[in-house]
Amino acid sequence: MKQEFTRIAVKVGSNVLARRDGTLDVTRMSALVDQIAELNKSGVEIILISSGAVASGRSEIHPQKKLDSVDQRQLFSAVGQAKLINRYYELFREHGIAVGQVLTTKENFSTRRHYLNQKNCMTVMLENGVIPIVNENDTISVSELMFTDNDELSGLIASMMDAQALIILSNIDGIYNGSPSDPASAVIREIEHGKDLSNYIQATKSSFGRGGMLTKTNIARKVADEGITVIIANGKRDNILVDLLQQPDDTVCTRFIPSTEAVSSVKKWIAHSEGFAKGEIHINECATDILSSEKAASILPVGITHIEGEFEKDDIVRIMDFLGNQVGVGKANCDSAQAREAMGKHGKKPVVHYDYLYIE
């Protein structure tokens, strides 16, 4: 059955766009652009999250002296991003499609204001027939605030832009029930909510990127929980994007079945804000049980056992259960001093209101 998506996010990994020697595979890039153009002309809005800047720059410049990993990455990215976006511009122009470059950093998602500003920018681009091409701005990203890889960025973009599907293109067909190199292994075609995949995932990283299948799976789960279909497929297969939408039953991939529960725009932002958390709120067993139920509940002071770190009102905080496991993230309704003052008391205002609480 044909997939009727009207807006999708497509993430293309470094291993799809780079040859074995690290140079840009222009032939593969051109083929992907042809497919995106075909889908775009059929009425599908597409946001492209593209790796490949570092791989592209690696083939363009040879440092005069040995550089540390950060300097080398920034150099290759600065040179390679210009080459990458220029190539995309030329390829899409052949189809009469305009593209716009969106370079972002993790810090740009840390506040609701910056988050909405980015969303508005890309919304205007889509409304005017422009395909946003998104990548992390490696030249100014600091190591401790870099995305794990573009899988993490693509999940955030898909969520922010209310995409109906996120397609992650890698160099394998999906998630296998064994080692991908084992002929007896098969691709897991569908993954339902809550299915345990820990026995199947190998925490290995790609040759040119920073991510691996473990990262992809974690991102896919979070995005699917927000009601977005997530597909992991092989970007080196001919016509893969068109086939995924027009012949999904006959196309090998791993599909994460989305949750049917609606998630608000604010909670989507909070769900991806864990990396900006300023503190931790630890709750007792009773509060933990309430949060794990179907009941809509806020974090009340009476259920808090202790607070770690210092935070201000509206900062992101982690919610930890009575065993010390993270169960969610939320936006603080007061600062840490006020939270400590109210801790354990009845009749006090929520420290984290339900409307600004995301339970994992």
UniProtKB/Swiss-Prot annotation:
Annotated positions binding ATP: K11
The keyword Kinase belongs to this UniProt entry's keyword annotation: yes
Any one GO MF annotation of this record: glutamate 5-kinase activity
Enzyme Commission number(s) of this protein: 2.7.2.11
Pathway: Amino-acid biosynthesis; L-proline biosynthesis; L-glutamate 5-semialdehyde from L-glutamate: step 1/2
Entry's Gene Ontology BP terms: L-proline biosynthetic process; proline biosynthetic process
Cellular compartment(s): Cytoplasm
Name used for this protein in its record: Glutamate 5-kinase
